[in-house]
Amino acid sequence: MQAHELFRYFRMPELVDFRQYVRTLPTNTLMGFGAFAALTTFWYATRPKPLKPPCDLSMQSVEVAGSGGARRSALLDSDEPLVYFYDDVTTLYEGFQRGIQVSNNGPCLGSRKPDQPYEWLSYKQVAELSECIGSALIQKGFKTAPDQFIGIFAQNRPEWVIIEQGCFAYSMVIVPLYDTLGNEAITYIVNKAELSLVFVDKPEKAKLLLEGVENKLIPGLKIIVVMDAYGSELVERGQRCGVEVTSMKAMEDLGRANRRKPKPPAPEDLAVICFTSGTTGNPKGAMVTHRNIVSDCSAFVKATENTVNPCPDDTLISFLPLAHMFERVVECVMLCHGAKIGFFQGDIRLLMDDLKVLQPTVFPVVPRLLNRMFDRIFGQANTTLKRWLLDFASKRKEAELRSGIIRNNSLWDRLIFHKVQSSLGGRVRLMVTGAAPVSATVLTFLRAALGCQFYEGYGQTECTAGCCLTMPGDWTAGHVGAPMPCNLIKLVDVEEMNYMAAEGEGEVCVKGPNVFQGYLKDPAKTAEALDKDGWLHTGDIGKWLPNGTLKIIDRKKHIFKLAQGEYIAPEKIENIYMRSEPVAQVFVHGESLQAFLIAIVVPDVETLCSWAQKRGFEGSFEELCRNKDVKKAILEDMVRLGKDSGLKPFEQVKGITLHPELFSIDNGLLTPTMKAKRPELRNYFRSQIDDLYSTIKV
């Protein structure tokens, strides 16, 4: 059909008459056309656009030919893992030097006192202080060599990074000590790493170390450097047992008066001995090189290069322990790009205040914090109308997520989610979670509510924090993403649990430049973790999904048999049961002489009372924990969830005891990384376990 025929068909004038036709239209009509055109143009220009993924999201990893089923990131052009993203950054020392340049000597490390703004040190100030500390160490007789270990026993603060960079500038190695490791583990690490000098933040930690020297438990310790103010009695106590107690300021002055030229490390040199807190036995010292850390950082930058682009305008809130590799990798990425790092005040209860003042753009988190945020948001929706609005708004935003759209400027953000976004400072554009599994429900909701790029990672200390990461544009939950560009991942058979690699299931194994060098002075443990071909065996059970992402489905290390011979993986069962609304923590237990499982359940103090009230139960939290009918109702809810999640009948617990006190680091039932200490839990609840087995008849 010709154009003039088309106009005639719709009874419209031909183009030559169009001007005359427009003149005959009423002014209101013309204004309406103009407004419609303007609105259409505005919508087209500002409509939400999905984040462009860096690869085909239906195939995020690729099998490597001749590798026994190993898969690599689809972002790579070859089967060789990525080692360095920037040619001039092959060590953490070089990464910091790059940060000095790209930041144009901008602010680097910030801290604050209560009710005060953040005060900042510039990149060059940090570099100068770092070289002073490193020079002071040399003046004290320490070697510029990758077998020279220096201890850091402190919470996150600017001095932590200054000491770290001071060690790196002169090829020394840092050995972080956890605040919550406990006296025995600290003594073990000081001796294992042969630490003769330890930096501490508070006098109380210096006293703890001096006590070990006085009791001849750590005879090799000779110098303690204290960051905070302390009294003369601490110096005198040290002198009596042959330990020099000095201040951070004195070390800076000593180094300033005796400056040495930096002696940077090689990529293959050790950077950190990261002691992992095992659930049994002594901590193991993972030996991690500069190459390990830089390759892991490079992989994150590669995976997000078109979406995140860290820059000097970014600000990181530092509150997750720097003694853990997750936080260390995040901070190394920030420093390499000239970004700012603001430290929390040291009290997790003041974190929300720190967030409001700092207004970070980058916020790494752990699932425990996400669960609290989720519970708090839904706890505030305390009427039927508020709950309906929250559900409706989250579903609208989750629909956008499924289309790949991430934003924080929708109608629902302004009406519903603005408050929670503002509570984090109002500028967060990047969040990363790792260290433990996170509920798909919680992750999806918070991705929608917070309206920022929110990635989930998976890994462990032995592969320098991360080996898998969710892909930009893939905002689905329930998996840990594809292999990072720095490593390959393969699954191997676990016959005793009926997981077969040929069926896409098995133990997760990792190989690449991010895999550690072994455990310090422990060849037997190293051989358990690293096979002869260099594959790290994680102990986690994974499953390949059709789109090439990995789902963690089980845990190998804590399996046990029941009397009938069935293998049980308790952590998988616990993760399912903890989805129950009134449940905060669960310890699932079984024995080879018993035919069924039981559990110790810690109810959620914030939700139990309201949950019980809806079911007709009244009383305080402690009274409800003693109520047999409440216990029965919670057990029924757990079993329902287990059935819905596909647990086999023998994987379901047959009885529970309600315990009102949370498992914690303080009571010795959790490790510093918040993992259950199963032997300690077994001993702690021995009488309750025996009672359950004696009273339940199956």
Swiss-Prot record:
Residues found modified as Phosphotyrosine: Y84
Ranges facing Cytoplasmic side:
46-698
EC annotation from Swiss-Prot or TrEMBL: 6.2.1.3, 6.2.1.15, 6.2.1.24
Annotated glycan sites: S135
According to the UniProt entry, which residues carry N6-acetyllysine?
Answer: K207, K356, K386, K632
Keyword Membrane on entry = yes
Q: Which GO terms describe its molecular function?
A: arachidonate-CoA ligase activity; ATP binding; long-chain fatty acid-CoA ligase activity; oleoyl-CoA ligase activity; palmitoyl-CoA ligase activity; phytanate-CoA ligase activity; pristanate-CoA ligase activity; protein serine/threonine kinase activator activity
Mark the residues carrying the PTM Phosphoserine. Answer: S620
**Chain positions found as N-acetylmethionine:** M1
Cofactors named for this entry: Mg(2+)
Which residue positions does 3'-nitrotyrosine occur at? Y9
Q: Per the entry, what modulates this protein's activity?
A: Inhibited at high temperature and by arachidonate.
Keywords (alphabetical) are: Acetylation, ATP-binding, Endoplasmic reticulum, Fatty acid metabolism, Glycoprotein, Ligase, Lipid metabolism, Magnesium, Membrane, Microsome, Mitochondrion, Mitochondrion outer membrane, Nitration, Nucleotide-binding, Peroxisome, Phosphoprotein, Signal-anchor, Transmembrane, Transmembrane helix
Name of the protein in its database record: Long-chain-fatty-acid--CoA ligase 1
Please provide one cellular component term from the Gene Ontology annotations of this protein.
Answer: membrane
Pfam families the UniProt entry points to: AMP-binding
What family does the Swiss-Prot or TrEMBL record give for this protein? Answer: Belongs to the ATP-dependent AMP-binding enzyme family.
Q: State the annotated membrane topology for this chain.
A: Single-pass type III membrane protein
Q: What does this protein do?
A: Catalyzes the conversion of long-chain fatty acids to their active form acyl-CoAs for both synthesis of cellular lipids, and degradation via beta-oxidation. Preferentially uses palmitoleate, oleate and linoleate. Preferentially activates arachidonate than epoxyeicosatrienoic acids (EETs) or hydroxyeicosatrienoic acids (HETEs).
Where are the bilayer-spanning segments? Answer: 25-45
Main EC class of this protein? ligase
